[in-house]
Amino acid sequence: MDPNTVSSFQDILMRMSKMQLGSSSEDLNGMITQFESLKLYRDSLGETVMRMGDLHSLQNRNGKWREQLGQKFEEIRWLIEEVRHKLKITENSFEQITFMQALQLLFEVEQEIRTFSFQLI
């Protein structure tokens, strides 16, 4: 697991949790929850790849891991759209920077998950 990605996740989550977006705070909390879920999934997939012999364990534990992988990519695409939308409507520079960094992080994580999944297939 890339230490920069871990610190980026932690930084983005901390900054998002400090934001007050008025009536959209539920949306922001949902995004934070999705980010946390995505981080956990990415970490577990990365650990599985590092153990390499663990593919059978992954398949036994979750026979539908490819379906789950597809769902995670859908979540990433949803998060990307949500972050882009928030970026368009916010005028606060702190929030704009946070959402731009969140968007970059999502693209990086999507690429990492693709790389991990190709190694497992």
From Swiss-Prot:
Superkingdom as given in the UniProt entry: Viruses
Xref: InterPro entries: Flu_NS2
Main location: virion
Alphabetically ordered keywords of this record: Host nucleus, Host-virus interaction, Transport, Virion
Function of the protein: Mediates the nuclear export of encapsidated genomic RNAs (ribonucleoproteins, RNPs). Acts as an adapter between viral RNPs complexes and the nuclear export machinery of the cell. Possesses no intrinsic RNA-binding activity, but includes a C-terminal M1-binding domain. This domain is believed to allow recognition of RNPs bound to the protein M1.
Subunit structure as annotated in this protein's UniProt entry: Interacts with protein M1. May interact with host nucleoporin RAB/HRB and exportin XPO1/CRM1.
Protein name: Nuclear export protein
Species annotation: Influenza A virus (strain A/Singapore/1/1957 H2N2)
